[in-house]
Structure formats: structure tokens, C-alpha cells
Amino acid sequence: MGNHKAALTKQVFTFASELYAYGVREVVISPGSRSTPLALAFEAHPNIKTWIHPDERSAAFFAVGLIKGSERPVAILCTSGTAAANYTPAIAESQISRIPLIVLTSDRPHELRSVGAPQAINQVNMFNNYVSYEFDMPIADDSKETIDAIYYQMQIASQYLYGPHKGPIHFNLPFRDPLTPDLNATELLTSEMKILPHYQKSIDASALRHILNKKKGLIIVGDMQHQEVDQILTYSTIYDLPILADPLSHLRKFDHPNVICTYDLLFRSGLDLKVDFVIRVGKPVISKKLNQWLKKTDAFQILVQNNDKIDVFPIAPDISYEISANDFFRSLMEDTTVNRVSWLEKWQRIEKKGRKEIKCYLEQATDESAFVGELIKKTSEKDALFISNSMPIRDVDNLLLNKNIDVYANRGANGIDGIVSTALGMAVHKRVTLLIGDLSFYHDMNGLLMSKLNNIQMNIVLLNNDGGGIFSYLPQKESATDYFERLFGTPTGLDFEYTAKLYQFDFKRFNNVSEFKNATLLSETSTIYELITNREDNFKQHQILYQKLSEMIHDTL
């Protein structure tokens, strides 16, 4: 028995120390019995912060938020059985978003698998479709090989924590009773750092010269995931190229004349210019209309992504590069005789008129876009905006016009689950305001527990149209009118003031935009600001904006 305890202690303390060595500073633990050895190891490590969350689904998304806020890998730990399955949505989001989430599932020893033992399901390869790397660790014994397995596997897995290969990894760790390590053996807990991998690639610019010497080019920038963007702006300035900047690109914070923000509304309203080439940078953009245009244009498309598994959506490019945006555009710097001034000025002219129409519209609007416009005005440069999927991210895409604020969202799998938890995880490291709809909020209300337990301050702006507002813009609204409200509108009739009381948030309700204009977003007290809106009115007012922009494009071109 003594040998077992010593072997278990050495295994879990070494594992915790190796995670620290590769950059882990935070672990989110969902309590359970089988995870006792590792939970105690993390708790005993002097330089690892532990967070306790009883709901595994919410805990995993909270960790995703910690990663977004700290730009470091974060681990999650749970007990054996169905607890692990609750991690799946956040792992799927992490895989598509290239987020280094380290998934640690405790398991029954091998002799208790597939024999009907309690809390024992097949956990080996259970996230196979969503993780970049996975390994079923050996059971603790007193052999050197068991400890070597930790060193070897962590070294292999570390390539997925940084650089172009980032993504979630999964270690399944079986533990045999008794489960308590020797907490006095703290000399086994180390805080040494490993040399982290560095990735950089160059390109042969001459291979693209015949394309880039054409006149009508565009740079389209999606989610940059913390990459530097200064060379994009430099290249655009030198070579007179418009930049269509997604709100997650962080380029809209720059007051740069080449940054185009209104493109979604412009394409939605009929804009269709002939283009010779497109340089697509980063993740796919939010705008459905821009993605539809990319699918049908005959422009030569270049894709630049700093990861090994490129996201070709919405259409496979003609050529792609696995390289950082800054390295790519730095490699292209050369003399050129192409004069693009008139091409750039055409885009700048349309952008200027588009912004004017949007501002005029917002001065009179009373729909959700008016609330979103006011929120953007109220958000300071010190705050980050975390935007829920569905309608909120689309309104921000349309209405955020060059303001120095950082915008974040879960745009990997684009789900509405885990939004509150992700934003709260970010709020540990940044001042965050969350913009979210009522159904997304309902989906993750239990995530608010982390704010209550850990005094994490965050403001929540809740757009409440009592249902799924985005479905009003889809064909089923007209083709399935008899069933629309029940199947798609899905009203809940919930009073979220009770949610605020349950989790000790302040609560303020606004029935119109005028009331919200006079409100102040507090920075010291966590508050839910509920904005009451109407789905049908919201749809009708958006159509008015589209029509105004359509008329502007017709008159301008």
C-alpha cells in the first residue's frame, strides 16, 4: 500500500509540474472522487491557480474564456463517467477556434472498464473527432517508464499548445484506489519552464507577383486570434488596398482610411464590384453575405492562416500559406507600378456614405440595433466586448465602426451554449461586458455561479425579445407560418430579474432605447441590463436600413 501511495504521488505531482513547465497557470476543476489525486496535486502546486466549478459543461467554457483572456493554455479536470461527456461542446469550439484547452478526464483502472462498474464509460478516444492529440496514460506504479511516459507525452502534446498547431488535447488518466497522494511530498512539485516551440515560415513573393500586380484587389481579415496586424495596415497603405475587417480582426479599433466596416450591409444591399484578387487572412469572417460573395466571385483567392489545418470556408482558395499575417505581408514588400488610387477611393467613398446612412438610421431607430449602437458608444477603451452568437454578433458586425475596443466571440462552432461561462473566464483577466440574447443567456445561466463564488465582476447586456430573433430573417418564417412561433420563435416568458437575484447580480430593465441612452454601465458591480425588444419590429426596422443602403449604392455607382 505504501508503494502505491508513493507511486501515485510521484505520478500526479510530476504531471502537474510538467503542465506548469509548458505554460499552464490555471486549472478548472469539477469536483468528483476519481479525480482526487490530480485535484490535490494542482491544489498543492504553489504556482497554479485552481478554479472550482460543479458543472462540467460550464467549467469547460469558463476555461475557454480564461485562455482567451490570458493567452495561455488552461487545463480542465473532471471525475470519471458521464461527467467527461459534458466537456464536448467546449472541446468542439476549441478545436475549430484553435484554442489550447487541456482536457484531463479521470478514469477507473483498466480492470474496472467494461465490466459494469459504476461511473465507468469508455473514455479512451471519446473526443477523437475534436482533439489534436490524445493519450490514455498508464496506471501509477513504481517504474521509471510510467514517469517517462509523462515527459514523452507532454513533449509531444506541447506542439498543440502554441504556434500554428494550437488546439485541444486530451489525457485520460486512470487511478486505482486509494486515491489520496502524499501531500507532504511537495519537493516533487516543481516550477521549471520548458523551451516552447517557435514557428515561422517565409514565402517566395515572386510566385505571386503576376497576381498582385493586378489593379483591383481586396484584403479580407477575419478573427486574428491575438496575432499582430501592423504589417497588414502597412501593406494596405503602401499598395492602396481596401481592408474588409471582421469585428474579431481587431482592425476596426484603428482609425485607418483603408479599413472598411460596412461591407456586410453593402453586400446585403446589392454591392457587387469586379475584383481581380482577394487576400484572405485569419479565420472565416462572420458576414454571411461576404462569404456568399467569396463563393461566387472569379477573383484569384490567397488564404493566409497561421495554423497547420487551414479553414477553407467558404471556398477553397487558389493558393494558401501557413504563416503569420505579419510575416506574409512583410515578405511581399517590393516596388510596384500598379496605380490603385481610384480603386481604393471608390471603396472609401462607398464606406463613407454607408457609415452616414447607418448613423442617420441609428438616430431614429428603436430596435435592437439601436440598443447595440448605444452599447458600443458606452463601451470604453478599457473594456472588452464579448458578443454572443446569433443576432448580437451580426448587429455588432454591422454597427461597430472604428472604435478602439477589443471584440471577442466563440466563432468556432458558433453555438449559443457556454457564452456566459466563456465571458466570465475572460473577465478574470480583462474588464468584460457581455452582449447576449435571451435564449443564449438561458442556455448558460448556471455559468453565473462562478461570478458569485469568486467575485468576478462582469456587466451583462441582455437583449430580450422572448425567443429566437434570428429565425425571423430565415426562409422558414414565410414558408412555415403556422408552425414558426412554436418551432423557431420559441418564447420562454422568463423573468430574468429572478436570475439576477439568485446569483447576486444587480438588475436593471429598459423598455426602450431612450431609457438606455441615459444609463451608465457600472464598472464596480456585476449588473444585468435587460433590454426589452420586439422580434417583428426588429425585423421590419432592419429592412428599412437595407433599403436605404441599396438606394445609396445605386446612386453612388
Curated annotation (Swiss-Prot):
EC number(s) reported in the record: 2.2.1.9
Reaction(s) catalysed (UniProt annotation): isochorismate + 2-oxoglutarate + H(+) = 5-enolpyruvoyl-6-hydroxy-2-succinyl-cyclohex-3-ene-1-carboxylate + CO2
Pathway noted in the entry: Quinol/quinone metabolism; 1,4-dihydroxy-2-naphthoate biosynthesis; 1,4-dihydroxy-2-naphthoate from chorismate: step 2/7; Quinol/quinone metabolism; menaquinone biosynthesis
GO molecular function ontology, one term from the record: thiamine pyrophosphate binding
Function statement: Catalyzes the thiamine diphosphate-dependent decarboxylation of 2-oxoglutarate and the subsequent addition of the resulting succinic semialdehyde-thiamine pyrophosphate anion to isochorismate to yield 2-succinyl-5-enolpyruvyl-6-hydroxy-3-cyclohexene-1-carboxylate (SEPHCHC).
Name of this chain's protein: 2-succinyl-5-enolpyruvyl-6-hydroxy-3-cyclohexene-1-carboxylate synthase
GO BP terms, alphabetized: menaquinone biosynthetic process
Subunit relationships: Homodimer.
Keywords: Magnesium, Manganese, Menaquinone biosynthesis, Metal-binding, Thiamine pyrophosphate, Transferase
Species annotation: Staphylococcus aureus (strain MRSA252)
Gene: menD
Pfam family, one: TPP_enzyme_N
Cofactor(s) listed: Mg(2+); Mn(2+); thiamine diphosphate
Sequence similarity: Belongs to the TPP enzyme family. MenD subfamily.
InterPro entries to which the protein is assigned, alphabetical: MenaQ_synth_MenD, MenD_middle, THDP-binding, Thiamin_PyroP_enz_TPP-bd_dom, TPP_enzyme_TPP-bd
Keyword ATP-binding (UniProt): no
Lineage: Bacteria, Bacillati, Bacillota, Bacilli, Bacillales
Record note on cofactor: Binds 1 thiamine pyrophosphate per subunit.
